[in-house]
Amino acid sequence: MEQPPAPKSKLKKLSEDSLTKQPEEVFDVLEKLGEGSYGSVFKAIHKESGQVVAIKQVPVESDVQEIIKEISIMQQCDSPYVVKYYGSYFKNTDLWIVMEYCGAGSVSDIIRLRNKTLTEDEIATILKSTLKGLEYLHFMRKIHRDIKAGNILLNTEGHAKLADFGVAGQLTDTMAKRNTVIGTPFWMAPEVIQEIGYNCVADIWSLGITSIEMAEGKPPYADIHPMRAIFMIPTNPPPTFRKPELWSDDFTDFVKKCLVKSPEQRATATQLLQHPFIKNAKPVSILRELITEGMEIKAKRHEEQQRELEDEEENSDEDELDSHTMVKTSSEGVGTMRATSTMSEGAQTMIEHNSTMLESDLGTMVINSEDEEEEDGTMKRNATSPQVQRPSFMDYFDKQDFKNKSHENCDQSMREPCPMSNNVFPDNWRVPQDGDFDFLKNLSLEELQMRLKALDPMMEREIEELHQRYSAKRQPILDAMDAKKRRQQNF
């Protein structure tokens, strides 16, 4: 793969002259890197300096207040452990946010590409930089609120930087704690889920979960429905490693200090930087081998995809010349072949192969944002806003509607019959209203086993029914709000 030219001078901030030009005059966009919060992220070169940057292109119809908040927080940050912000452009219907480029990608990308979890030494080195980033943010009275391996980026030298401030928040003197449920379900601190108010140490809980994620490939509860996890995190004891005997006492103790359920007793970033597991961390040079390996795999896959696209185009041209083409006589068969090819490619990655729940449900949850205002880069809670009766974490599942609908439209022959059918469970299997379970004594062992086996699917069905009822109540309110906003704009 062709290497970008060496930078002529280090880019610190885009000049006023650069910001008045069209972005295409200032940058050469090279390739798409992936999806961030609210938009797609591209790799580009700043023409004047030759420096590689990342550009997040955000559709204007996205939540503009959240985007402005992300830019505001990034603008205020100046730390080698936080992704730098260079400037923004409006281009047609997109906002272009120009940021520091981290060539190795996220920690979760590297785990996926290599199909390997990280060693203790690698984890300690990454956590040391991450804690320095959190110490800086928390000193600035900012909460990241979405710490996970996917939001810790590595540059090619191995330096870890915090990224994706789409859901970050600002603490002020007049607001000691926040009450909004924001983040990604499996990484959330108990106090965030319970909406009892939280502060900077909520990020420390998420860091503890991230430590387990880096060691085991996925966070605790990743194999179960996120709604169930949301109920389990505040009530269950703090999670631990699946096989504690594989990990050192120092690492186990570090995770234990992060995952203290009481926020008052949880360690701070500054305290954790003095923990033996972090103090004994090795230099970033130990990460170069895994970074090189991950980048080589990524480049190889990119070349394979390009070849496949070229082959498909050639085959398509040949098919058009053939009067009895496969596409014409058996288009469904071709579709099935492509689906199988995609599945086999996905199976090469550990997380996609082992946990479909993880792939589909780890999106970032943003709740109650209507109750927050942006004012001079500072987030403030509106104390006069009416109490919301709806459990706020239900909003996260509204975001999954599109994915769920697309799954429903999948070819039925490619999957087992759905166990969520309304006809699967008799009504008399539901929990008795009076709470009297004495009737269970009269059932046979086989009937009891069937009931036990059916509990999880029944729960899934009831959760889905509850979600649908809330969605039906919520949509008219959203429609009315949209109508009012449109009238105000027209006025």
From Swiss-Prot:
SUPFAM superfamilies reported for this sequence: Protein kinase-like (PK-like) (SSF56112)
Keywords: Acetylation, Apoptosis, ATP-binding, Coiled coil, Cytoplasm, Kinase, Magnesium, Metal-binding, Nucleotide-binding, Nucleus, Phosphoprotein, Serine/threonine-protein kinase, Transferase, Ubl conjugation
Positions of modified residues (N-acetylmethionine): 1
Bias kind Polar residues: ranges: 326-343, 381-390
Class in the EC hierarchy, top level: transferase
Regulation of protein activity: Inhibited by the C-terminal non-catalytic region. Activated by caspase-cleavage. Full activation also requires homodimerization and autophosphorylation of Thr-180, which are inhibited by the proto-oncogene product RAF1. Activated by RASSF1 which acts by preventing its dephosphorylation. When autophosphorylated at Thr-180, recruits STRIPAK complex and promotes PP2A-mediated dephosphorylation and inactivation of STK3.
Catalytic residues in the record: 146
Region (Disordered) residue spans: 301-343, 370-392
Cystine residue pairs: none
Assembly description: Homodimer; mediated via the coiled-coil region. Interacts with NORE1, which inhibits autoactivation. Interacts with and stabilizes SAV1. Interacts with RAF1, which prevents dimerization and phosphorylation. Interacts with RASSF1. Interacts (via SARAH domain) with isoform 1 of NEK2. Interacts with ESR1 only in the presence of SAV1. Interacts with PKB/AKT1. Forms a tripartite complex with MOBKL1B and STK38. Interacts with RASSF2 (via SARAH domain). Interacts with DLG5 (via PDZ domain 3). Interacts with LATS1; this interaction is inhibited in the presence of DLG5.
Protein known as: Serine/threonine-protein kinase 3
Organism: Rattus norvegicus (Rat)
